[in-house]
Amino acid sequence: MGMVSEFKQFAMRGNVIDLAVGVVIGAAFGKIVTALVEKIIMPPIGWAIGNVDFSRLAWVLKPAGVDATGKEIPAVAIGYGDFINTVVQFLIIAFAIFLVVKLINRVTHRKPDAPKGPSEEVLLLREIRDALKNDTLKPPGAL
């Protein structure tokens, strides 16, 4: 079998296709969560604590300036606001995945139905056993 046909067989297996679909859906879901966090969740929180735009929050270590030649030097800052947004996004995605996994586990790991009682064969064997114990089962022609 040639390398191309082996690759084709590998690529067309169900797990690879499922994984590819999962990656595409995950990327789209990530974009939805990003928009949810940046446009819907964080603005009211920022407004509630004093009109703060979380994406612009930063600790400035060195302010922007101009050097001796007139060239602009950008500020050196730690953008913790973006980090807060990313943490909120992560928590939303992690919770959504938790709910999906919990649902899948509930569907796939159902408890088996309780047995409905002994089968007819078991009941018949019990009757035979009890008859033999009580010596009520006699062969034909026996005294």
UniProtKB/Swiss-Prot annotation:
It is found in: Cell inner membrane. It is a multi-pass membrane protein. GO terms for cellular component: plasma membrane. The keyword Cell inner membrane applies. Gene3D superfamilies: Large-conductance mechanosensitive channel, MscL, domain 1 (1.10.1200.120). SUPFAM superfamilies: Gated mechanosensitive channel. The chain crosses the membrane at residues 16-36, 84-104. NCBIfam families: mscL, PRK00567.1-4. Belongs to the MscL family. Homopentamer. This is Large-conductance mechanosensitive channel.
